[in-house]
Amino acid sequence: MNLLLTNASIVTVETNDTGYLIKHNHFINIINGKIAQIGGMASCPLASSGKQLDCEHKLLTPGFIDCHTHLVFAGNRANEFEQRLTGVPYQEIARQGGGIMTTVNATRKATEAQLLEKALQHLSGLIKDGVTTVEIKSGYGLDLESELKILRVAKQIEQQANIKVSTTLLAAHAVPLEFKDNPDRYIDYVCNTIIPAAVKAQLVDYVDIFCEGIGFNLKQTERVFKSALSFGLGIKGHTEQLSNSGGSALAAKMGASSVDHLEYLDETGVKALADNGTVATLLPGAFYFLRETQLPPVELLRTYKVPIALATDFNPGTSPIASLLMIMNMGCTLFGLTPEEALRGVTCHAAKALGLAQQRGQIKVGFEADLCLWNIQHPAQLAYEIGTNLLISRIINGVLCND
C-alpha cells in the first residue's frame, strides 16, 4: 500500500484542454494506496517504509478506465459475423431472433464458474493494455436470476483480479422471448422485480437501457430511469447508435453520468449533454465491427465542451475487441480525435462517466494510486502503436501488479 516512485515522467492528465503537461524527473509518494505527494526529484523524500520503484524516466499515466463493457457472457457470435459480411444487417439478424438473444440463451445455461472463467480470459487483454478500472454490464440474462448471476460474476472478477469493477444493470437490453408480445410488461418486470432485487443484493452501481428502434422507446426508457433513481442508483444509456430517438437528451436531463454510442446524436442532444454535465462515451469498436458510416458529431461535442470518453464496448456481437489501446487508435483514425483527447477519454473522462472523477483518472494528491508505467517516449504513442507491448507495470491502490 506504500510505494515511492522515483525518476518518473508524469502525465498528470487534466480535464481541461491543457496539453499533456508532462512533469519530467518527478517522484510520487504513495501512502495507504493513495497519492500523498508529488514533486521534483530534488525534494524527493526517503522511502521510510514500503517499496521503491525507479521509473527510469519512463512515462507514468493514470491507470486506464474502460467505462463500457459487456464482459460477462457465454458463447460467441462468429456465425453472425459471417452473415453480416454477406450483407445481412445487424438489425435483421436481431429481428430473426439472433443477436443479443443468441448470447442470452447461452448465458442463461452457463454456470457462474463458466462465466467467470471466460470473463477472466477476456479481461486479460484489457489488463495488458493498462486497464485498472472496468465497468461491467449485465444484459445477457433478461430474467431475474440470470441478470443477478452476471452481476455476481462481475463482483467475483474484482475479488479475483487486480482491478476495480463498476457494475451496471442492463436488464433493459432487449425484450426476451417470453415477453416479446408485450414489451411494457417486461419493463414492469425490470422496474418492479429486477432492479429492486439487484439493489437488495448490493450488486449494482448503475442502471442502463438500450434506447433504440430495436430496443426500447423513450417512455419505457424514462420508466427504467425513474425506477433506478428511486433507489439512488446512477443512470446511463445506449443511445443514438442506429437512429436519432432523443434518448441522449432524455438521459442527460434525468441526470445520466454518460450516454454511449451516439453516432446519430444531433445538436439538440449535444446541448443537453453540455447543459447537464453528461459524458459522451464513443465506442469506435462497434462502429468498426458493424462497418457503420454515420460518424458521431465530434466537432459539435468539442464546440459545446462535452467530455468525450472512449471504451471498448467489449461484447460478443458488435465489438469483440479486448484492447483499449486499439480503441484509442480507432478513436483517432475513425472519429478524428487527437491522441490527447483519446488519452483523456480513457482516463479522466472515463472516470467521470463512472462517477469516479474525484477518485481516479488523474494523477493528483488524494486520488487513488492507480497508475501505469509505459515504455514510450511520448503519450501520443499510446494511440499510435498497435500490437506492441508498451506496458511495463500497472499499479493499483499503490500495489505493484505483476500481470
Swiss-Prot record:
HAMAP family, per the entry: HutI
Keywords assigned: Cytoplasm, Histidine metabolism, Hydrolase, Iron, Metal-binding, Zinc
A GO biological-process term: L-histidine catabolic process to glutamate and formamide
Subcellular locations according to the entry: Cytoplasm
Positions contributing to N-formimidoyl-L-glutamate binding: 140, 315, 317
Top enzyme category: hydrolase
Manner of cofactor binding, per the entry note: Binds 1 zinc or iron ion per subunit.
Binding site residues for Zn(2+): 68, 70, 238, 313
Cofactors: Zn(2+); Fe(3+)
Pathway, per record: Amino-acid degradation; L-histidine degradation into L-glutamate; N-formimidoyl-L-glutamate from L-histidine: step 3/3
Catalyzed chemical reaction(s): 4-imidazolone-5-propanoate + H2O = N-formimidoyl-L-glutamate
EC number(s) on file: 3.5.2.7
Species annotation: Psychromonas ingrahamii (strain DSM 17664 / CCUG 51855 / 37)
UniProt binding sites for 4-imidazolone-5-propanoate: 77, 140, 173, 241, 318
GO molecular function: imidazolonepropionase activity; iron ion binding; zinc ion binding
UniProt keyword annotation of Iron present: yes
Record's protein name: Imidazolonepropionase
Keyword Disulfide bond: no
Job of this protein: Catalyzes the hydrolytic cleavage of the carbon-nitrogen bond in imidazolone-5-propanoate to yield N-formimidoyl-L-glutamate. It is the third step in the universal histidine degradation pathway.
Homology family: Belongs to the metallo-dependent hydrolases superfamily. HutI family.
Highest taxon above the source species: Bacteria
Gene name, Swiss-Prot/TrEMBL: hutI
Short name of any one Pfam family annotated for the protein: Amidohydro_1
Phylogenetic lineage: Bacteria, Pseudomonadati, Pseudomonadota, Gammaproteobacteria, Alteromonadales
Predominant location: cytoplasm
Binding site for Fe(3+): 68, 70, 238, 313
Gene Ontology cellular component annotations, sorted alphabetically: cytoplasm
